[in-house]
Amino acid sequence: MGARFGVHSRAWERLTRYRWCMSFFDMTSDADVEDDLDRVETDVVVDCDIEAAWALVSEPGWWVNDGPLGDHEVTLGDDGIYRVSDPDAGDWLIEKADEDPMDVVAFRWYPLADDELPDEYATRVEVSLSEERGGVAIHVEESGLASVSDDEAEARQAYDDAIGMWEQVLLAAKNYLEGR
């Protein structure tokens, strides 16, 4: 159905999911609210080619910045875990979970501490690309935020931080890719 209107299928799926979610807006329960605190999604359309966008988003920890995107030092350990070093944001451990080149890449990281990657608390960051409106749409979804801590207040803070962080990071990615 989405292709009939010239809308990319992934974008159509997101729009359909958004409309479905909004139809239940007034029927949220406590369980729904808890689920809502588990996932952050955001998008940006960038005026660049898909190869340039992929070169950025497929690098482990590309989002670890404090301000504009900068140069990272990324090293792969013997355990398959990447150490991403940023002069301002510090060192972070990140694992590449899945990858389908030029389409989607997923990582695992622990947003509350830079020196560990505990299985039970790590979140999943999935980044997908699609060609839209003459540019490239970068879609980010971070899930698992409700379980980053056994402390509900700390998990809520991680969710709130992720919302602001991803909006800022995608704006920085747009500026970086369009300014090349």
Spans of model-derived segments:
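Hydrophobic/aromatic beta-strand elements that line small-molecule binding cavities or substrate pockets
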Residues: 44, 92-98, 122-131
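Hydrophobic pocket/interface hotspot
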Residues: 53-54, 82, 96, 107, ...
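Hydrophobic ligand-binding cavity/cleft-lining segments
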Residues: 13-77
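Beta-strand/loop substructures that line and gate deep hydrophobic ligand-binding cavities in soluble
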Residues: 114-164
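Acidic, Ala/Val/Gly-enriched low-complexity intrinsically disordered segments
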Residues: 3, 7, 11-13
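A conserved amphipathic terminal alpha-helix motif
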Residues: 18-25, 144-180
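Intrinsic-disorder/low-complexity, polar/charged segments enriched in Ser/Thr/Lys/Arg/Asp/Glu/Gln
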Residues: 37-43, 81, 91, 104, ...
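Glycine-rich portal/gate segments that line the openings of hydrophobic small-molecule binding cavities
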Residues: 71-114
